[in-house]
Amino acid sequence: MLNAEQRAIIKATVPLLESGGEALTTHFYKMMLSEYPEVRPLFNQAHQASGDQPRALANGVLMYARHIDQLEQLGGLVGQIINKHVALQILPEHYPIVGSCLLRAIEEVLGKDIATPAVIDAWGAAYGQLADILIGAEENLYKEKEEAEGGWRGTREFRLVRREQESSEIVSFYFAPVDGMPVLKAEPGQYIGLKLDIDGAEQRRNYSLSALCDGKEYRISVKREAGGKVSNYLHDELKVGDTLQLFPPAGDFTLAASDKPLVLISGGVGITPTLAMLQAALQTRREVHFIHCARNGAVHAFRDWIDGLAARHPQLKRFYCYAEPEGGAAADAVGLLSEDLLAEWLPQERDVDAYFLGPKGFMAAVKRQLKGLGVPEQQSRYEFFGPAAALE
């Protein structure tokens, strides 16, 4: 536990983290990935290059410092971190590496006049406290997944049994376990971790499960990303019959039980977790409003499948919005999703459960629009790993 003096020091560094947190975490990642190559597979290099990962860490460190006296207020953020760590198999031995590099980064970026021994000591204690919380919670989750029916710990060998082209950009991959035994049933909205060897280098990635799990196989649907090492490998190299290692499903962006009308809003490849949510909701005969936004029909994945569901389930209402239509299948609206469109497509009664996912700008707009239409904020759920202010 931190003492009162250490907590006061942590809180005093908040202004420094607000102004220079990203510079600190950028330096931290550069140092750690250079000196400890064994942890490189745990981090997406594209997210490093774009700055997304340093920004997300800077936000996490800042939130921790701000709430050092009220850690219970970080429950949502901590839950996200724990699930991400479990999906990538972050282990206790990784924490000392992160801790030592973080303390060095604080000292080197802030300078010894600011990063005094007392400051370093306080942040060392704070990091140790956080590490203990995460390690304990992650072990509980590892154990839970290992002991569940169809579950396992660490990696498990799976074979690609089918792949399907869903749009000009998205391919679905179906994986079944090589041992032929059942697999852990994921909750709708969760993701799975992949461990691959590409050009002699280990790569790990998380992908949302895009179908309700039947206990026999998993499906992910991957968009080809320009310069994306793993997405391009999956699209171009992974063939039916090939094997790879999977980690158990994880994630806390999941469909909660409710009898309220369900609103699922997605942009682009953000559609993937909503598909499993849609399947689960239709099994309960729940009213569902499914709204998807895409550039055009060529990149719109799963349209025929969703249209088929709508034809068989009168409680499902689906709406499509295309930003730049290029002929082919028509959309219900053209342009960007607006509050006026949402007002038309949502139930008249705004007491709904809304789940949305997509690019950052899209999510910021949807969050604002739902609030403007009177959807209770506590009933609007999304998954975003950056600063919450980025969606305001």
From Swiss-Prot:
Chain sites annotated for binding heme b: 85
UniProt key word Transport: yes
Region called Reductase, residue ranges: 150-392
Record-marked site positions (Influences the redox potential of the prosthetic heme and FAD groups): 84, 383
Chain sites annotated for binding NADP(+): 268-273
Catalytic activities: 2 nitric oxide + NADPH + 2 O2 = 2 nitrate + NADP(+) + H(+); 2 nitric oxide + NADH + 2 O2 = 2 nitrate + NAD(+) + H(+)
The protein's required cofactors: heme b; FAD
Active site per database record: 95 (charge relay system), 138 (charge relay system)
InterPro entries on file: Cbr1-like_FAD-bd_dom (IPR008333), FAD-bd_FR_type (IPR017927), FNR_nucleotide-bd (IPR039261), Globin (IPR000971), Globin-like_sf (IPR009050), Globin/Proto (IPR012292), Hmp (IPR023950), OxRdtase_FAD/NAD-bd (IPR001433)
Gene Ontology terms describing biological process: cellular response to nitrosative stress; nitric oxide catabolic process; response to toxic substance
Cofactor note: Binds 1 heme b (iron(II)-protoporphyrin IX) group per subunit.
Binding-site residues for FAD, renumbered to this chain: 191, 205-208, 384-387
Site (Involved in heme-bound ligand stabilization and O-O bond activation): 29
PROSITE patterns xrefs: FAD_FR (PS51384), GLOBIN (PS01033)
PANTHER family linked to this entry: FLAVOHEMOPROTEIN
Function field: Is involved in NO detoxification in an aerobic process, termed nitric oxide dioxygenase (NOD) reaction that utilizes O(2) and NAD(P)H to convert NO to nitrate, which protects the bacterium from various noxious nitrogen compounds. Therefore, plays a central role in the inducible response to nitrosative stress.
Stated name of the protein: Flavohemoprotein
Organism: Pseudomonas putida (strain ATCC 47054 / DSM 6125 / CFBP 8728 / NCIMB 11950 / KT2440)
